[in-house]
Amino acid sequence: MSAIEMKLDAELRTETGRGASRRLRRAKRVPAIMYGGHQEPQAITLNLLQLDRLMQEEAFYSQILTVNLDGKSEQVIVKDLQRHPFKPLVEHVDLQRVVAGEKVHTSVPVHFVNEDKAPGIKAGGIIHHDLNEIEIACLPKDLPEYLEVDVSALELGSAIHLSDVPLPAGVEIPELVQGADHDHPVVSIHASRKAKADEDEAAEGEEGEEGAED
């Protein structure tokens, strides 16, 4: 778990529009909205420096955060970050309230372990991370910080799919409910381009020899 407390101090936002957003940025504030949880949406602002610090943590994007507003605390998850198209700026943050007894749908990062032990890697293959995060559904109390995928047994030309990913108790992958076509690969090992070219060249050579014999 992250050693940094996942907490944001918020203020109610009374002004809207582009001009108001520019004034907020000058005041080191970021516009945001907090919605869900059977309550009305609230337009708020967040402390830019505090937000920047938390955004350095992987857990910020997948874990439950505490928002302090007017002396009250709200539990939320980050649903969207709107970034400036070419400047390193966050222009708006969407936060969804979390209710203890209701499932949340969010994406968590995937941590790949034991890649150097994979037979496919030892055979000269190239590993490809098809998915770096996976959407899950669970109660807030069961929300994992990440999912771990062990690739130590992965062979050349094979893949680990969503259905192969070990899940903590109470966690499910909604994509799998939609059928086998949605059982996407998470990580795979393919032959390198050079190895593939060598194989193709060898195959062509064998075909040429067979033709000469005929």
From Swiss-Prot:
Q: Segment Disordered: which positions?
A: 189-214
Gene name for this UniProt entry: rplY
Q: Does the keyword Magnesium apply?
A: no
The identity of this protein, by name, is Large ribosomal subunit protein bL25
Protein species of origin: Alkalilimnicola ehrlichii (strain ATCC BAA-1101 / DSM 17681 / MLHE-1)
Q: Name one GO cellular component term.
A: cytosolic large ribosomal subunit
Q: Name one Pfam family in it.
A: Ribosomal_L25p
The protein's role, per its UniProt record: This is one of the proteins that binds to the 5S RNA in the ribosome where it forms part of the central protuberance.
According to the record's subunit comment, the protein's assembly and interactions are: Part of the 50S ribosomal subunit; part of the 5S rRNA/L5/L18/L25 subcomplex. Contacts the 5S rRNA. Binds to the 5S rRNA independently of L5 and L18.
UniProt GO BP: translation
- What UniProt keywords apply to this chain's record, in alphabetical order? Ribonucleoprotein, Ribosomal protein, RNA-binding, rRNA-binding
Q: Acidic residues bias located where?
A: 198-214
Does the keyword Ribonucleoprotein belong to this entry?
A: yes
Write down the InterPro entries for this protein, in alphabetical order: Rbsml_bL25/Gln-tRNA_synth_N (IPR020056), Ribosomal_bL25/Gln-tRNA_synth (IPR011035), Ribosomal_bL25_b-dom (IPR020057), Ribosomal_bL25_C (IPR037121), Ribosomal_bL25_long (IPR001021), Ribosomal_bL25_short (IPR020055), Ribosomal_L25_dom (IPR029751), Ribosomal_uL5_bac-type (IPR020930)
Q: Which domain of life is it from?
A: Bacteria
Give the family, as the similarity comment puts it.
Belongs to the bacterial ribosomal protein bL25 family. CTC subfamily.
Q: Which GO terms describe its molecular function?
A: 5S rRNA binding; structural constituent of ribosome
